[in-house]
Amino acid sequence: SCVGEYGRCRSAYEDCCDGYYCNCSQPPYCLCRNNN
């Protein structure tokens, strides 16, 4: 399964659902954010 918006992810892009990317700009966690 994939991770939705604001869900925690690792640095791997694949963790997030389609249309989202893994954003690590706010440590300590990486969160999935919308590509738009």
Curated annotation (Swiss-Prot):
Its chief place of residence is secreted
Report where it is expressed, by tissue. Expressed by the venom gland.
Report the locations given in the UniProt record: Secreted
Q: Please, which domain of life does this record's source organism belong to?
A: Eukaryota
Q: By its UniProt entry, which InterPro entries does this protein fall under?
A: Beta/delta-agatoxin_fam (IPR016328)
A GO cellular-component term linked to this record: extracellular region
By its UniProt entry, which SUPFAM superfamilies does this protein fall under?
Answer: omega toxin-like
For this UniProt record, give its keywords in alphabetical order, as a comma-separated list: Amidation, Disulfide bond, Ion channel impairing toxin, Knottin, Neurotoxin, Secreted, Toxin, Voltage-gated sodium channel impairing toxin
Which cysteines link up through disulfide bonds?
A: C2-C17, C9-C22, C16-C32, C24-C30
Q: Its Gene Ontology molecular function terms?
A: sodium channel regulator activity; toxin activity
Give the transmembrane region(s). Answer: none
Asparagine amide modified-residue sites: N36
Q: What does the sequence similarity comment in the record state about its family?
A: Belongs to the neurotoxin 07 (Beta/delta-agtx) family. 04 (aga-5) subfamily.
**Role:** Insecticidal neurotoxin that induces irreversible neuromuscular blockade in house crickets (A.domesticus). Modifies presynaptic voltage-gated sodium channels (Nav), causing them to open at the normal resting potential of the nerve. This leads to spontaneous release of neurotransmitter and repetitive action potentials in motor neurons.
- What does the domain comment read? The presence of a 'disulfide through disulfide knot' structurally defines this protein as a knottin.
Task: Return the protein name.
Answer: Mu-agatoxin-Hc1a
Organism ancestry: Eukaryota, Metazoa, Ecdysozoa, Arthropoda, Chelicerata
